[in-house]
Amino acid sequence: MQCPPILLVWTLWIMAVDCSRPKVFLPIQPEQEPLQSKTPAGCTFGGKFYSLEDSWHPDLGEPFGVMHCVLCYCEPQRSRRGKPSGKVSCKNIKHDCPSPSCANPILLPLHCCKTCPKAPPPPIKKSDFVFDGFEYFQEKDDDLYNDRSYLSSDDVAVEESRSEYVALLTAPSHVWPPVTSGVAKARFNLQRSNLLFSITYKWIDRLSRIRFSDLDGSVLFEHPVHRMGSPRDDTICGIWRSLNRSTLRLLRMGHILVSLVTTTLSEPEISGKIVKHKALFSESFSALLTPEDSDETGGGGLAMLTLSDVDDNLHFILMLRGLSGEEGDQIPILVQISHQNHVIRELYANISAQEQDFAEVLPDLSSREMLWLAQGQLEISVQTEGRRPQSMSGIITVRKSCDTLQSVLSGGDALNPTKTGAVGSASITLHENGTLEYQIQIAGTMSTVTAVTLETKPRRKTKRNILHDMSKDYHDGRVWGYWIDANARDLHMLLQSELFLNVATKDFQEGELRGQITPLLYSGLWARYEKLPVPLAGQFVSPPIRTGSAGHAWVSLDEHCHLHYQIVVTGLGKAEDAALNAHLHGFAELGEVGESSPGHKRLLKGFYGSEAQGSVKDLDLELLGHLSRGTAFIQVSTKLNPRGEIRGQIHIPNSCESGGVSLTPEEPEYEYEIYEEGRQRDPDDLRKDPRACSFEGQLRAHGSRWAPDYDRKCSVCSCQKRTVICDPIVCPPLNCSQPVHLPDQCCPVCEEKKEMREVKKPERARTSEGCFFDGDRSWKAAGTRWHPFVPPFGLIKCAICTCKGSTGEVHCEKVTCPKLSCTNPIRANPSDCCKQCPVEERSPMELADSMQSDGAGSCRFGRHWYPNHERWHPTVPPFGEMKCVTCTCAEGITQCRRQECTGTTCGTGSKRDRCCTKCKDANQDEDEKVKSDETRTPWSF
C-alpha cells in the first residue's frame, strides 16, 4: 500500500476587531449542498457493492485476475417513479491508450497502457466517465540548505488540504427536561477513506459508544468506548475505517451527526453535526465551554485559538449552542478572558440567533499573558445580557489530541548533512499545564555527544535559535526531562511542526543529527502510548552502513500472537537520482540477528512515503522465539542497500506456542471483543455493555465467537446484540471415496490429506502453511475447504472457501445454484443453499444433463459439460473467450491456469501473440500477420 506523506494546510480567517462598540459578525459555516437522496443506491458486481459514479477494474478471481484494460462504471439511473438506481457498464480502455513516444515501450505491472522506461504512466482519459476520487499528494522537493525535512504551508495548495472536520456536541434543545449539561468537542481527520477522530468531553460519564448517523437518524457506524481506549482520561480515540463513497459525500456536505451514547440511555445524550472549519489547521489552544449554572442544560460552546505568525495576537473562533435572546435575531454577548477570577480582556459583540459562531482577535498579549496561556491559567467566558442572562465558561488549554508527537533525527536532515549511520529517536508529551516532557534515544554517533538542543528553523546558516538546552539531561545515550517554562509562542510552534531537535558531537559541532518534531496520526496501535520506539540505524546493520537515513518503530504482540508494527523513517530516497528524491522506497523486514541463517527473514511491507504500518498474523515459531529472546531485528531495505539500510533490535517477551490461533475444543479463540490493534475488552466494561450476551454462565462480548460447552467440537456460537446464535459446523463435500475422521476435527478429510497433515504437523509452525480467515477470525490449515462463518450473518452455506497454503490466501467462491424448470422448487433442508425440484418433477433438460454427466470424471463449467481430460479456453461474459487461460477437466475437477510468459532478450525485434511477447521470425509470412490483425477482438488482453 502506498503511503505518501500528506501535508494539510488551512488558513485562519479573522475579522478585524474594534472593542469600543458591539459588532455583528458573519456566521462561520461551510457551504452546504442539498441532500438529493436518503436511500443509498449503487451497483452490485462480482459480489461487491459500488456507489453511484464509482469506477473500478473488474476482478474475475483466480486464475483470471484483475482486468486492468477494462474499466467498469456504476452509471446513475432513475426509475419511472424517480427512485435512483445504478447500472454497470464496462468499457475496453486499451484503445484509449496514448501512443508512446519511444521506440521500446514497456508494460508496467498493474497497468493497461505501455509507457516509456522511466516515464510516469499516462493518465486514463476521463471523457466518458466522471471521477470524484481522493487526492494523493506528493512531497515537494525542498532543497533548503538549513532544514531539508522542513514542511510548510507553501508545499500544499489550500484546496488540497480540506480534510479536517469538527463537531460541537451538546444536549438536544427539543428534549425536555434535558438529560445532561455535558459538552464535547470532536475533531476529525480524513485520511483517504479512513476517518480518524478524537473526542474530548466534560460533564458526562458512563459512555458506551460513539454513534455516527445521517440527518434522518439512520445509524451509519458505531464505535465502542473502552476504558483502556485512549491516552487521556477525558478523550476518546478511534477510527472509522473504509468509508464508502456515499458516506464520504454525506461527510463533505455536513450531513453526518456524531453522538455520545451512555450505558444508562439507549438514545444519544449529546450530539452535533460534523462540519469543515478553517480554524482547525492552525488551532493550537482550545476550550470547552459549559454552563456555569448546573440547572442550565442543553447549551455549550467551543473555542479554537491560535497565535499570529509574528505578533503576539490571539485569534479565536467561538462555536456556541443554546444561547437565546429576548427579541429579534441578534443576541448581545460579553466575552471575557480571566486569570484567577480577574478579568484581563473583554469585548462586546452581537451574534445571530440562528448561527451562534463568530471570530475575534485579542491584540498584543503581554509576556505574562503568553505564559498564563501556555500553562492553562486563562479562562474564557461568554455571557448574555437581559432579564434572564446565560453564561458559560471553560479553561483554555493546549489542544488535546490522540496523535503522537515524535521525531526521527538523522544525519541527512542535519544543517550540514552527514552520513554516519547514527540515529536519534524522540517522543514528546505535552501536558495540560504546558509542561513539555521529552524522551530521546541517541545511538551510533561517530564521537561523543556534546549538546542536545530544541531549536527553531534558523534564519541563516550560521545563526541557530536555541529555545531549550537539554544537554544536562543526557546520560548514556538517553535524554529524559521536562521543560516547564515554555510560553504560548513556543507551544504554538511545537504544535505547528516548527521546532527541531539537534544533536551535536565532538566531530560535528553544528550537529550530526537533526529532526523535525511532527505529529504522528492516531493509528490504534496501543504500543505508542506504552513504550518508547525502537531506534533504526545504519550502524545496527551487519556490516554497518554509513547512511544519512534513520528511523524508529513501535512493535508489539497481542494475546493472539499477531504482530503489529508502525515504522517512521527519514532521509531515505535522498539519492542522486532526482526521480527517487521525493519519496522513500523501502521494504520493511523482520528477521533474526544471527548470521547462521541469513535467509530467514519475513517481508512485512514494501512502501512509499515516510511511514509504514500493518500487522502479521502468521509468524512462525522460530521468529516468535527470537522476539522472545531479543535476538530479532526489524529493518528497512532499499534499492541502494538491499540487505538493509537501517535496522533495530527488538525484544518482545512472549509465550506463543504456535504461529496462529485455531478454534479447538481446548482453546476458544476470542474471549473478548478486540479493540483496534488487539487489546482485550475489559471485563468490567462487559458487565456494563448492553449488547453483551450471557450464555452458559459466562458473559460474551458483542461480536465475539466461541465453541459452546455442550458441543465444543462441531458447533460455534456468536453474540450479536444480546442474542446468542449457535450453528452446527457444516462440512463441505469431499472429492474422495473414503473420507476419514480425525480425533481433533469435526469434519472428515480425505485419506491423502490426513497423511499430509500428519507429516506436516510438526513443521506447521515453521512453514506457516495456513491461512487466517478474517471473516470468523480463525486459523485454517493449508488445503482446508469450509463454509465461512461471517458474523453477524452466521454460517454462509452459499459459499465455499479454500486455504491456499503456498500463499496463505483465502479464496472464497459463491455456490452456483442450477437453473430449475419446475414451477415449485423446494429446499430439501432449511439450511440448504440451493433449491431443487421435487423428484417427481425433474425436467427433460435435467435428465439430459444427468446423462451427460454419467461419463467417468466429466466436469461442468458454466452451462457446458466437458469429458475427462478435455482442454478448453473458458468464456467469461462480457469479455469473451479468455485465450490466455486454459482449463482442464481432471477426474471431475476443473483446473484453470493462466499461460506463463518467459522474458525475451531479442530487443526491439519482438512481437506479441495472444498472451506473451516472442522474438520475431524473420521468415514470418505476411499473410499470417494480416490474419492475426483481422481476428483480434476488442476484448483481447
From Swiss-Prot:
* Gene, per the UniProt record: chrd
Q: Which GO terms describe its molecular function?
A: BMP binding; heparin binding; syndecan binding
Q: What is the lineage of its organism?
A: Eukaryota, Metazoa, Chordata, Craniata, Vertebrata
Give start and end of each VWFC domain. 41-117, 691-751, 769-838, 857-919
Q: Where is this region: Disordered?
A: 922-941
According to UniProt, the name of this protein is Chordin
Q: Major place of localization?
A: secreted
State whether it acts alone or in a complex, and with which partners, per the record.
Interacts with twsg1 and/or bmp4. Interacts with olfml3/ont1.
Assigned GO CC terms: extracellular region; extracellular space
Family that this chain belongs to? Belongs to the chordin family.
Check the record and name the SUPFAM superfamilies matching this protein.
FnI-like domain (SSF57603)
Q: What triggers its expression?
A: By activin in the presence of de novo protein synthesis, and by gsc and not2.
The positions making up the signal sequence are 1-19
From the UniProt record, give one GO term of the biological process aspect: dorsal/ventral pattern formation
Per UniProt, residues of the CHRD domain are 161-279, 281-401, 402-522, 528-655
